[in-house]
């Protein structure tokens, strides 16, 4: 009886190497409902991170204000602060990366693909970790510069530039807020990729 069942599986082109199974824990299988939720959550967070990163980069890239100060016309741009340039670059990279990974998630959902193997899971997990730390670092640097621009620094005798460029600072603040939200999504994505990676080790499956 066992032999007949194996023969039928072979005839249908199904083998242990191509059956789409997902394992979690010592000997358990992830319920189908949970699997769908995890995939949907990952897709949503990657799309949200992409959109927020694009919005942050666009707001900063288009941010400029011209004022006349002491009879001298000056224009404030994001390129005047290296921290904002770094933030634009980081969000541009995060947007491109999230778009590619989001497309992979969408294809996986639509095709019901087999769970990725360990090397691929490690690669995705590592890239997600790098992007999460990268975006958080860029946000932290930009927020520090924004605080100096808003409140100045008595120790270094740096003046409050936002007093002169209120619209520029307001738009830059909105861009930083979007970047913060994008970085938080990247952190959530790294947690999901960690779940997808380490569950492959629970049952001894998915080694290759």
Curated annotation (Swiss-Prot):
Extracellular side, ranges: 61-82, 150-174
Keyword Mitochondrion among record annotations: no
GO cellular component: plasma membrane
Domain of life (superkingdom): Eukaryota
Entry-linked Pfam families: CASP_dom (PF04535)
Major place of residence: membrane
Keywords: Cell membrane, Membrane, Transmembrane, Transmembrane helix
Chain segments annotated as transmembrane: 40-60, 83-103, 129-149, 175-195
Location of the protein in the cell: Cell membrane
Membrane topology (Cytoplasmic): 1-39, 104-128, 196-208
Membrane topology reported for the UniProt record: Multi-pass membrane protein
Similarity comment text for this entry: Belongs to the Casparian strip membrane proteins (CASP) family.
Subunit structure: Homodimer and heterodimers.
NCBIfam families on file: A_tha_TIGR01569 (TIGR01569)
Protein's recorded name: CASP-like protein 2U2
Lineage: Eukaryota, Viridiplantae, Streptophyta, Embryophyta, Tracheophyta
């Amino acid at each position: 009886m066992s032999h007949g069942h194996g023969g039928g599986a072979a005839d249908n082109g199904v083998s242990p190497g191509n059956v789409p199974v997902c394992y979690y824990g010592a000997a358990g299988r992830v319920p189908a409902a949970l699997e769908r939720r995890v995939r949907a959550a990952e897709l949503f967070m990657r799309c949200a991170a992409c959109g927020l990163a694009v919005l942050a980069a666009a707001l900063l890239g288009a941010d400029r204000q011209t004022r006349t100060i002491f009879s001298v016309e000056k224009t404030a741009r994001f390129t005047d602060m290296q921290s904002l340039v770094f933030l634009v670059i980081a969000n541009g990279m995060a947007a491109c990366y999230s778009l590619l990974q989001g497309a992979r998630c969408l294809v996986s959902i639509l095709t019901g693909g087999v769970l990725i193997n360990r090397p691929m899971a490690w690669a995705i997990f590592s890239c997600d970790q790098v992007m999460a730390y990268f975006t958080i670092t860029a946000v932290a640097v930009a927020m520090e510069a924004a605080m100096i621009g808003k409140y100045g620094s008595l120790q270094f005798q740096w003046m409050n530039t936002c007093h002169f460029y209120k619209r520029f600072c307001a738009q830059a603040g909105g861009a930083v807020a979007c970047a913060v939200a994008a970085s938080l999504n990247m952190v959530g994505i790294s947690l999901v990729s960690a779940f997808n990676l380490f569950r492959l080790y629970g049952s001894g499956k998915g080694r290759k």
